[in-house]
Amino acid sequence: VIRVLEIGDYAAPDAGRMLVGLGAEVTIVEPPEGVAARRTDPVGFAHRAAGKSSALPEDALALAPQCDVILDGTWGGPLARVAADLAEAAGDGAVHVVLAPYGDAGPAAGWAATDLTVAAAGGMLALIGRPDRPPLRPYGDQADQLAGLNAAIATLVAARAGGGQRVVVSGQASVAASLEFGAITYIHTGRVPERTGSTHPMAPHTLFTTADGLIAGGLGGSPRMWDATLAWLVDNGTAGDLADERWQDPAYRVRHRQEVFDLLAGIVGEMKRDQLFHEGQARRLPWAAVLRPEELAGNAQLVDRGFFVDVMTPEGPARDAGFAARVGGAAPPARLRVPEPCEHTVPAAAEPRARNAAATPRRRGALEGIRVLDLTWVLAGPYATKTLADHGAEVIKIESRHRPDPTRFSPGFHLSRSDETDPDTSGYFNNVNRNKKSITVNLRTQEGRDLALRLAAHCDVVVENFAAGVLDRLELGYDRLRRVREDIIVVSMSGMGHTGPWRDYVSYADAVSALSGWTALTGEPGEQPVGVVYGLADIIAGHHAALAALAALAVRDRTGAGQHVDMSQLETAAAHLGDAILRADRGETVEPLGNRHPRMAPHGVFPCLGDGNWVAIAARTDEEYARLAAVAGLPYDPRWTTLTGRKANESALEDHIAAWTRSRPAEAVAEILQGNGVPAYPVRDGRTLVEHDAALRAWEFYVPLAHPAAGTFLHEGLPARLTRTPGSVRTPAPRLGEHTAELLTDLLDLDETEQAALRANGVLE
């Protein structure tokens, strides 16, 4: 069991919650009266603190030598000195994880931060919202949670290396590494993606109004899905000219998707939401009801899979969102209780920290020696295996021209200045598949399935994101795999999970966002929600799959046992809804907030000089507002001197701030406000992230690598820096089947004659 001391309020509470979900013993370090969040945000505190204990700083100092990890979110705050003392007391064998909003180097290293400003700094805001409105923050402090998630991953990576190192996690880099197409579109095409409201710019999906609600859906992303959509329209007599030959071209469909949307709207508007959801799924289309938080508690799939947890709060028992993944041998406490302040005292004879015999000298990555079989495609799964590869694992990606990864071949995802039929030049594929090897194996053949099974026997971990049941039909299910390697770990990450009434339902990221409550809560107050259209839900699922694999490896190190981790992307998204489920359980009506915040004002995104330039500004306290008002020359108004007054008159206040920012460059606004201790940051887009952001440049975030087919281009780097096992972006993404002969020779001992026979039989295609 990993023992963690958690201190500070920047993203550490989120990281601590994720580690609690994987069986860690987490103790919050706080003053006698408790951390401020207990008083200012008791529901949010309960959500993040359940399952943890609490200790005074002096007791924590005595506990430190027995702890494995110091989880430090004090960056620039009043407890920073205490955190440093804890790290010193823990000694050289512990892992000190430092969460830094903008990294620990460069001009922004000491800047003030909130979730809003870090989301702006990392490029998240630029991708969300309607094109004629300001960039929009998603619900649930997603930038903070991404930093916490990367800290949790880095914690298990460092622990696997035997502890004894310092880790720095950049919140900005955590966001910048999670943008799907946000920056790589600029890197590979020179274009900057625009905000497209509720419509994904690469996949033809959007939101539709039904007779009684909203639903996410569209044309689908494959020929099969297009045929199913067309058949649906034909069955309803509203197909128009969609049977014409030109509509068979997927690029044409993407360009003219609004025509199809208009025809679909004719069906959707007359039907009830849930009827549409289930009929679309019956046609194997990734349509999804837009659910509100209060509906989630009765969600048949989440209930059947036991997702929700009971939490004992100071006000009594409550139902909350569960954890993103369940790993055997790494379970959270059976009783999730919100701790009383400083209840943890030092045992009379505290057990010393176990010294990990696997501790190693400095090396490239903590996962060197671990081999992963990658049976994933598109984004969520490849992101998981990319994370493992970045930290040194040998990742073998099985591909086939008979089931091509759409991000290699689809024009919508290709992102390249070159021939869009070339599978080796796709910027999308090449970004999330670096550091991997590629072998082409046709799993539609018995010989191909046998080869995959033989490869799995040489692997520690298998990661797959097929729909439920597909792996079993390929004769590669967990029960079959563990017969060839008893201690193998299989991480499945289907949309809905392998059990439950929706196990066979198909999903895209927008469907997961809709079903998890994200979509309903991301928008402007009083308006139809916009949702999160880019693949953030996919990337969060990928992070959690990597985290689950690391936890399962730690269990295997301890017990010798492998296991099957049955993840659900619906659950990973719902786990990131923040405290909304807990609030709904308490009877609160949870609504979209837009860019506003219940405990800060101003808290928004304001226009700046130049077309499409914006700055995020937040005042956390009355003192910060006073400094903002002085710098901006805002007129004195007694209503604005308190948070209550500012919230009651927020629109007028925002108008005054916008009048000041509109004539000034975003960089200048951010610099003068940060010089006065007020959180602010320009809203970065793909171009400004890559070309102009000094904090990411100081982090050395974008890494150039030469690709034999695509040339030299930048890759998104690592959000975490580890002193002893840093991980790296080492090799470009493989060409299709680049390592086939090498792997068949080195792992399976097949000679050239045997390989030639397999090729002749279509097995290696």
Annotate each language-model stretch with its function.
Residues 1-161, 274, 311, 344-561, ...:
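N-terminal helix-loop segment corresponding to the beta1-alpha1 unit
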Residues 1-3, 194, 209, 292-374, ...:
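Terminal low-complexity tails and localization/encapsulation signals of metabolic enzymes
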Residues 20, 139-140, 147-161, 168-169, ...:
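Extended, hydrophobic interaction surfaces within ordered domains
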Residues 25-26, 281-295, 395-398, 674-689, ...:
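Short, well-structured beta-strand/strand-turn elements
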Residues 133-142, 163-175, 194-200, 245-248, ...:
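Conserved Rossmann-fold dehydrogenase catalytic segment
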Residues 135-146, 199, 203-205, 214-217, ...:
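A short glycine-threonine-serine/GTX helix/turn-capping micro-motif
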Residues 158-196, 276, 292-293, 552-594:
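Substrate-binding/catalytic subdomain of NAD(P)-dependent oxidoreductase enzymes
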Residues 204-283, 287, 602-676, 680:
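Aromatic-enriched alpha-helical interface/lid elements that frame and gate functional surfaces
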